[in-house]
Amino acid sequence: MIFSTLEHILTHISLSIILILMTIHLIIFLVDEIRKLYDSSEKGMLVTFFCITGLLATHWISSEHFPLSDLYESFIFLSWSFALIHIIPYFTKNTKFLSKIISPSAIFTQGFATSGLLTEIHQSSILVPALKSEWLIMHVSMMILGYAALLCGSLLSVALLVITFRKNGKLFSGGNDFLTESFLFGENLFQKTSFFSAKNYYRTQFIQQLDFWSYRVISLGFLFLTIGILSGAVWANEAWGSYWSWDPKETWAFITWIVFAIFLHTRTNLNLQSVNSAIVASIVASIGFLIIWICYFGVNLVGIGLHSYGSFPSTSS
């Protein structure tokens, strides 16, 4: 009872802060000179991260299982993963721009997770027999962490495309201060460009930085996704006697894996190391962004297959 009350309080605190952060970001979008508001929003994100962490911990204790058994619990974990990835670059020198790009999505996922829209599917704390396995934490946590990292990396790729094809105007709030931070990284994919001048120096440097970090974040997410798929296959064999059954969730997870494998191949192929390869890879990652949401959220609308226990009650089989 105490933990349920604490969980309820943490949920409302998180949602209240998220609503305030949404208002702050709207003000910053309209009046981009107000930089102090951005600092306040970042501190608010830290508070919500700790609230979500406490929410996961109290829910784990009250339900007596790791909170990854349905769509509601997994979305809470996804929002926590998003927030974790968001705050890491905030405390790292020269990478705060990553937080600026990721923060809107982190705020959205946290707001949706704590809004109560998914509470209808979380009606019982009793696990179905298939979920009573030690593989639950390994498989689902790796998949969710993979989704979060791939989504964040894809957002950086989307930003790369926007900056590449946008020729005029400020890139982000704060004007050139955002771009004139030190750009220190180990490789230069754009050194063969023929239009290197003072006018496009910061723009080119920023594009390189986006490409550098999108590749690394997506690589990390791809590793998590691969581990999640393999552990899920082993778990499926133990539970149902088959490593793979091609149900909707498994099929779309495989499609997601293929898409980001193409991204990594395009990005690392020595014969394709050029500006165009970075753009092509970013386009692939942008497509992957949509596919991840179809795999994670869209498939649950169907409510069929071995993963239907995580879908909405109105569509569950």
From Swiss-Prot:
It comes from the Eukaryota. The chain crosses the membrane at residues 9-29, 44-64, 71-91, 101-121, 143-163, 217-237, 244-264, 279-299. One of its GO terms (biological process) is cytochrome complex assembly. One of its GO terms (cellular component) is chloroplast thylakoid membrane. Pfam families: Cytochrom_C_asm. Its main location: plastid. InterPro entries: Cyt_c_assembly, Cyt_c_biogenesis_CcsA, Cyt_c_biogenesis_CcsA/CcmC. Keywords: Chloroplast, Cytochrome c-type biogenesis, Membrane, Plastid, Thylakoid, Transmembrane, Transmembrane helix. It is found in: Plastid, Chloroplast thylakoid membrane. One of its GO terms (molecular function) is heme binding. It is a multi-pass membrane protein. Belongs to the CcmF/CycK/Ccl1/NrfE/CcsA family. May interact with Ccs1. Required during biogenesis of c-type cytochromes (cytochrome c6 and cytochrome f) at the step of heme attachment. NCBIfam families: cytochr_II_ccsB. This is Cytochrome c biogenesis protein CcsA.
